[in-house]
Regions:
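Flexible, solvent-exposed coil segments and beta strand-coil junctions
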Residues: 1-3, 25-30, 67-76, 160-165, ...
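Elongated, acidic membrane-bridging lipid-handling scaffolds
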Residues: 1-26
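Transmembrane beta-strand segments that form the barrel wall of outer-membrane beta-barrel proteins
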Residues: 5-9, 31-36, 166-171
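Amphipathic hydrophobic-ligand
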Residues: 15-23, 38-48, 67-99, 105-111, ...
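Flexible, surface-exposed loop regions and adjacent strand-edge segments
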Residues: 81, 127-134
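Extended terminal
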Residues: 99-108, 142-264
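Outer-membrane beta-barrel and related beta-rich outer-membrane complex signature
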Residues: 122-130, 207-212
Length: 264
């Protein structure tokens, strides 16, 4: 049996999909998705896969490719939050068992890769946040005037899905002055996330701002633990690794307080 579906436009909850074409075939309780193409969020998606109904619990396997997706539009539809922009590309192979949402999430396993071209985070300036933390802990302030938001370098990362969590492996990006490496996980059900962000000054010889001078003296990665929720309107809460910052922190009471906060 073979079925083809061709739709000019499909309205979903909060967004629209256009130019939808799907080709299904079935044989001996296996439904094959030969192709599913659609335009969405300013880009397009290609999906192939199958559903195996030969056992008591159905098993599904999908290969998902997203191309040139407008990240701001997608996040606004999913989380009502559009503070991150860029052009998203993603390849993901995923498999799961069952038919209800809870079983699908709990059994999902997969892997893939993601890249974002010209990423922009409008909520905070990451360099300013890092400088504020380092200079405050060192008992001084940065006099630099900072632009709003953070324009990042093109980023890439490896993805893994397991037990209801989306794990991000070795996300690599950076700003004008700082290299950034990040890894962590997002709980798909609660949308809570926690990441370890490591920042390193690119070229200490160009460290003109006081906070960058402090970083250049350390000449090592500065780790931050960041926590938040993808549905929240506020930016993530990030705490620096007190042991690494060690010599920068002059106030013992403040150091002890930050240790307690970072352990919460």
């Amino acid at each position: 049996t073979q079925i083809e579906i061709d739709l000019e436009q499909l309205k979903m909850d909060g967004f629209e999909i256009s130019n939808v074409f799907a080709d299904f075939s079935s044989f001996r309780s296996i439904i094959q998705l030969n192709t599913l193409n659609a335009d969405l969020f300013g880009g397009y998606a290609d999906v192939t896969g199958l559903v195996n109904l030969q056992r008591n619990i159905p098993r599904s396997e999908l290969k998902i490719n997203l191309h040139k997706i407008n990240l701001s539009s997608m996040l606004h539809s999913i989380t009502d939050n559009s503070d991150t922009n860029g052009s998203l590309n993603m390849d993901l192979n995923i498999a799961f068992n069952g038919i209800d949402l809870e079983n699908l999430l709990n059994s999902a396993v997969g892997s893939g890769a993601i890249s974002v071209m010209q990423p922009l985070y409008s909520e905070i300036n990451l360099e300013q946040t890092l400088c504020s933390a380092v200079t405050f802990l060192g008992g001084s302030r940065s006099s630099k005037k900072w632009p709003t938001g953070t324009l990042l370098q093109d980023l890439s990362a490896e993805l893994e899905v397991q037990s209801g969590s989306l794990m991000v492996r070795e996300l690599i990006s950076g700003t004008e002055n700082i290299d950034l490496h990040l890894h962590g996980a997002v709980d798909i059900r609660s949308r809570d996330y926690q990441f370890l962000l490591k920042a390193r000054l690119k070229d200490p010889s160009n460290a003109q701002d006081s906070c960058f001078n402090k970083l250049s003296k350390n000449s090592q990665d500065i780790p931050f633990t960041c926590r938040g929720n993808m549905s929240a309107m506020s930016p993530p809460i990030c705490f620096p690794d007190i042991d690494v910052l060690g010599g920068v922190i002059k106030n013992k009471v403040l150091s002890d307080l930050l240790r307690k906060l970072s352990d919460l």
